[in-house]
């Protein structure tokens, strides 16, 4: 799309923006416009347009591009300590890497200063955790995604099965509903991403997480062993090929009635009610995952440490884009991270999975705030898959994963 052409959604967003964008102190025109770089997709087109509307015309420059190009440009610019970029769109994993490199402006003081004005306490703790590194906030949350618990409401009612609140109740329900062509639960264990997400849930809901406060692995301790042992037992009720099942495969299994329940992303909920894709429209419902601790992911906008523009002005600009009224409209494009928006009755009528999304946000957990976590995940998931497929005993597999994780983190300076 050219810079002069707009999608219908962009036009709608632009028309709505002036109705609720609070006035923000103009940037210093002599210093040039605030430069924002961002990934291109409908939701981000909308939110970057809100940034442009937050300041007088010409005070904000927005450049939209593919995510790989945007991250590359931000990396090159910030690593050279250039002030050529003021604001960059970053997902939570990339934000961790940039914050660890010292390229981002900590936002804690600005957050406290403008907390009341922009109702920043409307973001749940799980979202704040996902935009923080070493206890400091580095990004304004814009888009969020959470895993939720999908279930066939008709099967639960017909069998008199109570909705699970704990992982043991989840196991019992999966065992009970595992009949005929219907598997008890989906399990998304394709490496690395699928298995890492599923393991994250088990290790938080049953175990004590991944690391202690000094980044020493604890997933091989008794609670972690119990978590992965239950995960192994649960595979008896999963569809065939669960070790190669990614999100697409698990989504299809739910849509086609080949599984009674399981963990999947918020972004997959709408397809359950799509008559062209789902055979069970209106029969699938959602709750927060049993035990909580499932993965949430959050994307936002961070301020470059090297920006020469007024940081108060920049912060107010991105806070305007992330305001309650802005996200009320933005909910048309993507899940908003504000609880007040997810509570909106009108939105709940339009998107019946929103109440479960809100409940899931409150109990979810982001990946550990470690810039090297995906490398850790590649190690650990390899051994978890060996454990759940009986190639190794669970304890032995997790011990080996912990040893290799410790060696990796030691080589990267995590331990004194």
Model-predicted regions and their roles:
Residues 2-101, 112-118, 163, 243, ...:
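Conserved N-terminal structural module of periplasmic/extracytoplasmic solute-binding proteins
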Residues 21, 133-142, 147, 171-217, ...:
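Extracytoplasmic/periplasmic solute-binding protein
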Residues 65-74, 167-171, 242-255:
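Short helix-initiation/N-cap motifs at beta->coil->alpha
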Residues 86-89, 260-265:
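Paired acidic/hydrophobic, glycine-rich loop segments that form the ligand-binding mouth/hinge
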Residues 93-146, 171, 198, 281-285:
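Hinge/lid segment of periplasmic solute-binding proteins
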Residues 108-122, 189-190, 206-226, 274-279, ...:
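Short, solvent-exposed loop/beta-turn-alpha elements that line the ligand-binding surface or hinge
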Residues 174-177, 214-243:
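Glycine-centered hinge/linker elements that transmit conformational signals in sensory
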Residues 267-280, 290-382, 414-416:
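C-terminal lobe and pocket-closing loops
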